[in-house]
Amino acid sequence: MPDISQRGQEMPASPIRKLVPLANAAKERGVKVYHLNIGQPDIPTPQVGLDALKHIDRKTLEYSPSEGLLSLRRKLRDYYRRFNIDVEVDDIIVTTGGSEAVLFAFMATLDPGDEIIVPEPAYANYMAFAISAGAKIVPVRSSIETGFALPEIEEFEKLITPRTKGILICNPNNPTGYLYTQKEMNLLRDLVKKHDLFLYSDEVYREFCYTGAPYISAFHLEGIEEQVVLIDSVSKRYSECGIRVGALITKHKELKKNVIKFCQARLSPPLLGQIVAEASIDAPADYMLMTYNEYVERRKFLVDGLNRIPGCYSPIPMGAFYTVVSLPVDDADRFCQWCLSDFEYEGQTVFMAPASGFYTTPGLGKNEVRVAYVIEKEELGKALEVLRKALDAGIPTVLLDRDIAGLDVGRVMLDNERAG
């Protein structure tokens, strides 16, 4: 049998999705599963977006331009300017979700063996995209004790080598919910300017900043405009994860020219998704305010509840809709798997994302999980009670020697495939 690629073998399993087979099996057993593992908002999609989808009247669903519909790019330009992000239509490339924007940014700027410095924990798919580009993620550790603030800039300096091409941030942050301050952003600006690096800035959660301070984009940093590669997506702000529409924004003309080549190779971003996204930019202000206020309430409810559970600790996230929580367990991976495979409380269990998958450094995040507050407060309350009961119960000793990560997930996946 032919061998698969080294790249395929190195590709990490998603900490967000790898336990889905166990969750599906739990549901088959009649267990109610509270999904705190994935950033899939439950807020309704804006009606203007849904109406645009319903009223599509085309005889042919044709390719769009490789860089995206001009009308959408114009709308996006106007949207960014509301946040004092001064970009032109030609700076904006529409992508198949924010994920493709990250991938194309890496493919167009990195050669095999090049390095990107990333504060960890970080969005797990960054590692997958770096592997796809043949590049290397170099982690710089942030810690739960400081609320996952930006590591000291000297720690970044120590990691810079001749192969370093850029620094990647997510602001507000997934998975931690941290929001970088003006001072921290200025320090990053000075660093990338000093070493002539790219600053890749994933800003898909910009609407969800809870400090009251002005939102700071990488494009607000003077003197590095052509070094900024901004990543965006409509998925989170409009509850439109399924339409797969994002954007890569750059003022670097040579970079844009090369990104367009990758766009042409994949032909076209989703036509129907672009139509919905364009309409959704006109979502009324009260929709965005309702969404914002809902997440503010959920955040307080969840963090207060987590910190009342003995042994649990969550910092207060300042943005996005996630928090990273330390649990009183030795192995959060096993605990999360056990919650789905063997534990239930009154017919319910909880699905969380083990935080170790958001770290590049082996051994870090071993007792941490990422929790997304994307379900209603009533369900969050029930999920917190289930978590409390699961921690009280603990993984039975008889199960500790079982290879849940390998045998059980593999068995469940096979059983699901056989069941059709």
Show where each model-derived region lies:
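Generic detection of well-ordered alpha-helical segments
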Residues: 70, 74, 289, 293, ...
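Short beta-strand to alpha-helix junction loop
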Residues: 66-68
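Flexible loop/hinge segments that line or gate small-molecule binding clefts
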Residues: 390-419
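Glycine-rich loop-to-alpha-helix module at the N-terminal edge of alpha/beta enzyme cores
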Residues: 36, 59-62, 75-78, 82
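PLP-dependent class I/II
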Residues: 2-4, 8, 12-14, 19, ...
